[in-house]
């Protein structure tokens, strides 16, 4: 069960190393929510391109040992898992950002068998493995940049 109001999300951005139409793709979210689900609004990534995501959030209380567990699904099948340590957060901090990956870039596969829909489910935990927030989003790996804007 999620402990409400400790983490509140403010923004979601997909950042690309190269992309026609701009390097940043901002997706609107409900500001102040600790449970964001953007899976119905996927964005497209060209196979072989480098990208990362940036999530803006705020914390209303101190958080010890904040981690983000990242679960990747391809066509609803578990595909991979990762955990990224965020660390300790002070109370009433408004301008925090979570970057994934923290260093470098993710690269979308160029193999035709890897093209298709992906869903990322991020679970933010802290204060002794307490569930604090969830953030879900989807993207489609395609052979080109056609329809690079989010699908509404």
Curated annotation (Swiss-Prot):
Keywords for the protein's UniProt record, in alphabetical order: Cytoplasm, GTPase activation
Top-level division of the source organism's lineage: Eukaryota
InterPro entries on file: Ig_E-set, RhoGDI_dom_sf
GO biological process: regulation of Rho protein signal transduction; Rho protein signal transduction
Location in or out of the cell: Cytoplasm
GO molecular function, one term: GTPase activator activity
GO annotations of cellular component type: cytosol; membrane
Function: Regulates the GDP/GTP exchange reaction of the Rho proteins by inhibiting the dissociation of GDP from them, and the subsequent binding of GTP to them.
Family designation: Belongs to the Rho GDI family.
Protein known as: Putative rho GDP-dissociation inhibitor 2
Organism, scientific name: Dictyostelium discoideum
Upper taxonomic lineage: Eukaryota, Amoebozoa, Evosea, Eumycetozoa, Dictyostelia
């Amino acid at each position: 069960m999620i402990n409400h109001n400790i983490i509140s999300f403010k923004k979601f951005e997909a950042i690309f190393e190269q992309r026609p139409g701009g390097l940043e793709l901002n997706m609107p979210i409900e500001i102040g929510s600790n449970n964001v689900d953007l899976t119905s609004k996927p964005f497209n990534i060209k196979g072989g391109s480098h990208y990362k995501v940036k999530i803006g959030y705020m914390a209303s209380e101190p958080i010890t040992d904040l981690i983000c567990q990242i679960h990747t699904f391809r066509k609803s099948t578990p595909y991979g898992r990762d955990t990224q340590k965020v660390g300790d957060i002070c109370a009433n901090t408004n301008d925090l950002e979570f970057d994934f990956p923290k260093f470098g870039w993710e690269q979308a596969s160029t193999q035709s068998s890897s093209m298709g829909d992906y869903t990322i489910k991020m679970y933010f935990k802290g204060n002794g493995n307490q569930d604090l927030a969830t953030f879900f989003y989807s993207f489609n790996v395609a052979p080109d940049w056609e329809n690079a804007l989010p699908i509404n």
